[in-house]
A protein has these predicted regions:
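12-transmembrane solute porter fold
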Residues: 8-22, 29-30, 44, 88, ...
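Extracellular/periplasmic helix-loop-helix junction of adjacent transmembrane segments
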Residues: 30-61, 100-105, 306-311
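Membrane-interface helix termini in secondary transporters
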Residues: 35, 63-67, 71, 159, ...
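Central cavity-lining transmembrane alpha-helices of secondary-active solute carriers
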Residues: 52-67, 119-123, 314-326
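Conserved MFS/SLC helix-loop-helix module at the cytosolic interface between two early adjacent transmembrane helices
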Residues: 60-99
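Paired small-residue
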Residues: 88-91, 99-111, 364-372
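Cytoplasmic helix-loop-helix junction between adjacent transmembrane helices
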Residues: 110-144
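Hydrophobic transmembrane-helix bundles of small-molecule transporters
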Residues: 162-274
Length: 466
C-alpha cells in the first residue's frame, strides 16, 4: 500500500483517463473501417472481423482480470493493462505501415486486454471513496464516460483516418493509453484483498472457453442464412462441456475463481440475467435498428449517412453522459435497485415510443426518443447494472462479479445483434420487420425488469436504511 493516500481528485483523474483510453479503443475506429479496408487492400468483412476479435478478446479478459487484480494489486493490474493496450495500438498502427492484416488482428487481440477497465476502475474508486453517496455520484461520472464522449471520439476517429490514414487513429490511442498507464501508476493507491491467494487458472480456462464459444455462436448466428450451423452445433457442445468442467473445478478447488455458493446466490445469477436481458433487448435497437429506420427512404425519413448520427447516436450518447452523474447521485440516496427499475421501465416506454412513431418517423421525433432512451438506458439502467456488480460483490472476492457482469454485457450485445435482426428479416425487410424486432426488444426488457426484482439489496443499501 502507498504511504501517502492520493486525493479523490487525483484518483478520479487517473481513472477517467483510463476509461477514456478504453473507450477510444472501442469506438474511435467505427467511422474508419471503410478506410482501413482500402488501405490494407482487403474486404469490409475482414475488417469487421477485426472488430469482432477485439470485442471478444475484451469480453474474455473481463472474466478473470478483475479477480487477478484482487490478488496482485489493482493499480499494478490497471497500469499493466494500459501499457499492454498501448503495445497493441502500436502493432495495429504498424499494420497500416506494413499493409499486414495479420498484424492488425494481433494488435486488436492485445488491445482487448483493456476490456475490464471500467469494472477495475469502479472497484478502485470504491476503495478510495468509502462514502456511499459520494461513490454513487463518481461512479456515474466514470460509467457515463464509458458510454462515449458524446460521439466526439467517433468523429475524431473519422477525421484522423480521412486526413492522415487509419494508422493515425491507433497512434492516438497509443498515446492516450500511455498517459493512462502513467496516471494510474502515479495518481492512485494500491489496493488488494489481504491474505494468501492463488489464481484458479484451471477454472479460468474453462470459463473463458465456455464464454468464448457462446460469443462465437452468436457472432456466427448474426450472419443469418450464411451462418455455419455445423460450427454453431459444435461450439454449443464445447460451451456446455466447458461450463460443466468449470462448475466441477469450482466445487473441488480450495481457492476457486468463483465459489459455487456465490454462483447460486441471487446476487450473482439475478444480476447477470438482468444485464444479459437488458442488453439483448436494447442494444441492437438503439445501435442498429433505429439508425437504420432513420436512413430508410421507404418508411423512414431517409437521412443520409453523413447526418444520421447527429439525430440518433450522438444525442443518445450526450443524454447518457449528462444523466450518468445524476443517476449515480440518486443511487446513493435511494438505492441502486430503485434507480435501475425506473430506468428499465423508462426504457420500455422509450421502445414503445419508437414503435409508435415508426410509421411516420421524422428527424425531430427520432431525436426525442433517442434522448429519452439515452437518459433511461445509457444514463440510468446501464450505470446501475455496472454499479450493482461492484456493491453486490463479497469482501473476500470483490473482483469476480464485476468481471462476470462485464461478460454479461458483451454476451447480451452479441445475442441482441443475432436475435433482433433475425426477427426483422423473418418478418420482412419493411416496417413489419422493424416493428417485430422492436416488440421483441420490448418483451426482453420486460423480462429484464422482472428479473431485476430478484436482485437482493446490496449491503450498502441495508446500512443506509439502518
Amino acid at each position: 500500500m502507498s504511504a501517502t493516500k492520493r486525493s479523490t481528485a487525483a484518483v478520479m483523474t487517473a481513472l477517467l483517463v483510463a476509461c477514456f483510453a478504453f473507450q477510444l479503443n472501442a469506438s474511435m475506429l467505427s467511422p474508419a473501417l471503410e478506410r482501413m479496408a482500402k488501405e490494407l487492400k482487403t474486404t469490409d468483412d475482414v475488417i469487421g472481423l477485426t472488430q469482432t476479435v477485439f470485442f471478444t478478446s475484451a469480453a474474455l479478459f473481463s472474466l478473470f482480470l478483475p479477480r487477478l487484480g484482487d490478488m496482485i494489486g489493482r493499480r499494478k493490474l490497471l497500469t499493466g493493462m494500459m501499457a499492454l493496450t498501448a503495445v497493441g495500438c502500436v502493432l495495429s498502427a504498424l499494420a497500416g505501415m506494413t499493409g499486414s492484416v495479420a498484424l492488425l488482428f494481433v494488435g486488436r487481440v492485445i488491445q482487448g486486454v483493456a476490456g475490464p477497465t471500467v469494472p477495475v476502475c469502479l472497484i478502485m474508486l470504491r476503495v478510495a471513496v468509502p462514502d456511499p453517496k459520494r461513490y454513487g455520484t463518481l461512479l456515474g461520472v466514470i460509467t457515463a464516460v464509458n458510454g462515449g464522449i458524446a460521439g466526439v471520439d467517433a468523429l475524431a476517429g473519422g477525421w484522423l483516418a480521412q486526413n492522415f490514414g487509419f494508422g493515425s487513429v491507433f497512434w492516438t490511442m497509443a498515446v492516450i493509453a500511455v498517459l493512462a498507464a502513467v496516471a494510474v501508476a502515479f495518481l492512485t493507491d494500491e489496493s488488494l484483498v489481504p491474505g494468501d491467494h492463488r489464481m484458479d487458472w484451471s477454472g479460468t480456462i474453462a470459463l473463458v472457453v465456455a464464454v468464448g464459444a457462446l460469443l462465437t455462436i452468436f457472432n456466427e448466428l448474426a450472419k443469418l442464412s450464411n451462418a455455419n450451423f455445423w460450427l454453431v452445433a459444435g461450439l454449443f457442445w464445447l460451451a456446455a462441456l466447458s461450463a460443466v468442467a468449470f462448475w466441477i473445478q469450482e466445487e473441488r478447488t480450495s481457492q476457486p475463481l468463483v465459489a459455487t455458493v456465490y454462483l447460486r446466490s441471487r446476487s450473482t445469477w439475478a444480476l447477470l440475467l438482468t444485464t444479459t436481458l437488458t442488453m439483448t433487448g436494447v442494444f441492437a435497437v438503439m445501435n442498429g435498428l433505429v439508425p437504420g429506420l432513420a436512413q430508410n427512404t421507404g418508411y423512414g425519413p431517409g437521412l443520409g449517412t453523413d447526418v444520421v448520427s447527429f439525430w440518433t447516436l450522438t444525442p443518445y450518447a450526450i443524454a447518457g453522459l449528462l444523466m450518468g452523474p445524476v443517476s449515480g447521485t440518486l443511487a446513493g440516496r435511494f438505492g441502486y435497485r430503485k434507480v435501475l427499475r425506473v430506468g428499465l421501465l423508462g426504457t420500455v416506454l422509450g421502445l414503445g415510443a419508437i414503435l409508435a412513431i415508426s410509421p411516420s418517423a421524422t428527424p425531430v421525433l427520432l431525436l426525442a426518443v433517442n434522448v429519452f432512451v439515452g437518459i433511461t438506458y445509457a444514463g440510468m439502467s446501464n450505470i446501475m447494472l455496472n454499479g450493482l456488480g461492484v456493491v453486490l460483490s463479497p469482501n473476500d472476492n470483490p473482483g469476480y462479479l464485476p468481471g462476470l457482469n462485464a461478460g454479461a454485457f458483451n454476451l447480451g450485445a452479441g445475442i441482441s445483434f443475432a436475435i433482433l435482426p433475425a426477427v426483422s428479416v423473418a418478418l420482412g425487410s419493411g416496417l413489419d420487420g422493424f416493428q417485430g424486432a422492436v416488440i421483441t426488444g420490448l418483451v426482453l426488457l420486460a423480462l429484464a425488469f422482472a428479473s431485476s426484482l430478484l436482485i437482493p439489496a446490496p449491503a450498502v443499501e441495508k446500512e443506509t436504511a439502518a
